[in-house]
């Protein structure tokens, strides 16, 4: 498995928006994204950090049920 890269928050948010996530709100230094699926609503919180730590991005990908390869295609 490849290492999760350290990316800026704006690139990550744009990638998730391409995947169908919608920005619901921005509060303080965090952005909240939602995506409705037939089974559930996936909710993500992205910190507005440049760059986002690799471990944080790894947890965000797990919450979104997305692989690193899928994220690379969306970037």
Where are these regions (language model features)?
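Residue-level preference for alpha-helix termini and adjacent loops
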Residues: 3-6, 45, 51, 73
